[in-house]
């Protein structure tokens, strides 16, 4: 006897007007994640997923393309306005925010949520080039 295939129901797309854009910008990469207000991921993109490799992932242009891709995917869910939370010291911070606005998302808030230690872990040693 063959097992009967159950009919898979098509997953309905959520409709979210308000979103939250989390931009994590390091020296080596930029990751843009767009979530709903509860924190469930709608779309994400990084400099690597848009085709950059190696040191080019840390550039502002790579961050711009990553933010653009994430914004386009999020707009399919009906996202119109976003709050932006930026984390990290990387080069792609400003470029990613500007790119979100250029893609047609209205930015209602920009907040820096970079974690700052109260003298926690010892930092890596200084580079001598």
Swiss-Prot record:
Key words of the record: Ribonucleoprotein, Ribosomal protein, RNA-binding, rRNA-binding
Assembly with partners or alone: Part of the 30S ribosomal subunit. Interacts with proteins S7 and S18. Binds to IF-3.
Family that this chain belongs to: Belongs to the universal ribosomal protein uS11 family.
Matching Gene3D superfamilies: Ribosomal protein S11
Gene name, Swiss-Prot/TrEMBL: rpsK
Gene Ontology BP terms: translation
Record organism: Carboxydothermus hydrogenoformans (strain ATCC BAA-161 / DSM 6008 / Z-2901)
GO molecular function: rRNA binding; structural constituent of ribosome
Described purpose of this protein according to its UniProt entry: Located on the platform of the 30S subunit, it bridges several disparate RNA helices of the 16S rRNA. Forms part of the Shine-Dalgarno cleft in the 70S ribosome.
Any one Pfam family match given in the protein's UniProt record, by short name: Ribosomal_S11
InterPro entries: Ribosomal_uS11, Ribosomal_uS11_bac-type, Ribosomal_uS11_CS, Ribosomal_uS11_sf
The protein, known as: Small ribosomal subunit protein uS11
GO cellular component terms given for this protein: ribonucleoprotein complex; ribosome
